[in-house]
UniProtKB/Swiss-Prot annotation:
Protein name, entry field: SET domain-containing protein 14
Gene: set-14
PANTHER family hit by this protein: EG:BACR7C10.4 PROTEIN, HISTONE-LYSINE N-METHYLTRANSFERASE SMYD
Compartments reported by the entry: Nucleus
Residues at which Zn(2+) 1 binds: C26, C29, C48, C52
Keyword Zinc-finger recorded: yes
Length: 429
């Protein structure tokens, strides 16, 4: 039986915008517009109308007092838990009933969670929560329970260009399982969350509308370690069981034909020319791989200056030359970091080159209609327009125009931007 059209859509049960986004989007409906009005009390959270501000007040009034007291906005996870506690105090558990929902009905109370006797992250969160919250406080065990459920059921909230702007919780859509080779991607039309199919293959059940809980463009062992630590399960999804795909993700470059790929093990053979890896080549490739793994934490460290990161990225890419295959996912964190560094330096040419290289790897493992691919092409098209490369920009924009219309509707901000860029590219000729 096919799912009804609205089965993979849901009005978010609760959400909280990131600190740096609370003044850029309406904190009730997630509309983005030039004229947002701030809350007259805390002067931090913004709204698109008085109607939205009144609708949000029952949740905002508790955090509003805390913001005024501390003269700062807490992080989005703390405020999301605070908002959910407010909803539960009014018996708003978000229950949804439908024949395709596991158990027919689903609400906050029956969301999965992983209770434990002691968890350092949980204890740290609870301590930080009560440092921000203003009395009267909810029960400490309730805050722990909400945190446990939010930790494994929440989604990143994004805007129509795929950029993260906060965190939210969906009651119905959180029933969808994980896959490292996802069938859907989480997208948003304002505060309506959607599980958007990444290809023509449509899920037949809500649980089977698998999306990736993590960045799936990592080696299998890293994916499994991440999932085990946060979600407490050993992943056995289609992506993890696809041996050829996983081997390609960590492939090394052939030392003879260069274009061929080899499994990252001693005596590996090139899948193209059949050459058996020499001991010297094995050591070179192993060194490059270990360097890429070791650099991940430094590349993700915001305290390290971008110029330092840029130099590290360039050295790593030199090391990866003729060792890690062009489609090896260990390249991705390096390329993402270098892309950000190039944008920060306003080096449009370098950013476009790096973004294009990143896209070529993504296309090996993700479908052309996957929103992740569409957003990457959208960013590249913006760079090509800025650089005056009309042919490249037009090609990308035409490829993403129709898929984005299906996801967001022709009147959405991202689609209007695409139309404007197409016109701009034509005027460049």
């Amino acid at each position: 039986m096919n799912l009804p059209p609205d089965a993979l859509h849901e009005n978010v049960y609760a959400f909280a915008l990131a600190r740096d986004q609370v003044e850029s989007y309406c904190n009730q409906c997630l509309t983005s517009m030039a004229e947002l009005k701030k809350c007259s009390a805390c002067r931090r959270l913004a709204y698109c109308s008085q109607e939205c501000q009144r609708a949000d007040w029952k949740l905002h009034k508790v955090e509003c007092k805390a913001i005024k007291t501390h003269n700062e906005v807490a992080n989005d996870s703390i405020r999301l838990v605070m908002r959910i506690a407010g909803k539960l105090s009014r018996n708003e558990d978000g229950e949804i009933e439908a024949y395709y929902i596991p158990g027919v009905a689903r609400n906050f109370q029956n969301l999965e969670h992983h209770p434990s006797s002691y968890d350092a992250d949980e204890e740290s969160f609870v301590k930080e929560y009560f440092q921000f919250a203003i009395a009267p406080h909810p029960d400490r065990d309730l805050i722990k329970l909400i945190f446990q459920k939010v930790s494994i059921n929440s989604f990143v909230v994004g805007n129509s260009t795929g950029n993260p702007i906060g965190v939210g919780l969906c009651i119905k859509l959180s029933a969808a399982n994980h896959s490292c080779k996802p069938l859907t991607r989480v997208c948003y039309r304002n505060r309506t969350a959607m599980l958007v199919p990444v290809s023509s293959e449509l899920p037949s059940t809500l649980e089977g509308a698998c999306h990736s809980y993590i960045d799936e463009l990592m080696p299998r062992d890293m994916r499994r370690d991440t999932l085990k630590k946060k979600y407490k399960f050993l992943c056995q999804c289609d992506g993890c069981l696809d041996e050829d795909r996983n081997a390609r993700m960590e492939a090394w470059t052939c030392g003879i034909c260069v274009k061929g790929w080899m499994r990252n093990k001693e005596n590996g053979q090139c899948e193209l020319c059949g050459w058996t890896m020499s001991k010297d080549h094995f050591e070179l490739c192993r060194t490059a791989e270990e360097a890429g793994i070791a650099a991940r934490s430094r590349l993700a460290n915001d305290a390290i200056p971008l110029e330092t990161k840029r130099n590290l990225c360039e050295k790593l890419l030199d090391l990866f030359q003729d060792t890690l295959h062009d489609h090896n996912v260990h390249r991705i964190p390096v390329l993402r970091c270098l892309y950000i560094c190039s944008l920060a330096a306003q080096n449009i040419t370098a950013a476009a080159k790096t973004g294009g290289t990143l896209l070529s790897i993504m296309l090996v493992y993700q479908n052309t209609t996957d929103p992740a691919i569409l957003f990457q092409k959208y960013q590249l098209a913006q760079l090509f327009c800025a650089a005056g490369a009309k042919t490249q920009a037009t090609k990308l924009l035409q490829e993403i125009e129709e898929p984005l219309e299906k996801i967001y509707t022709p009147d959405s901000m991202i689609c209007r931007n695409v139309y404007c860029m197409i016109l701009k590219a034509r005027n460049l000729s």
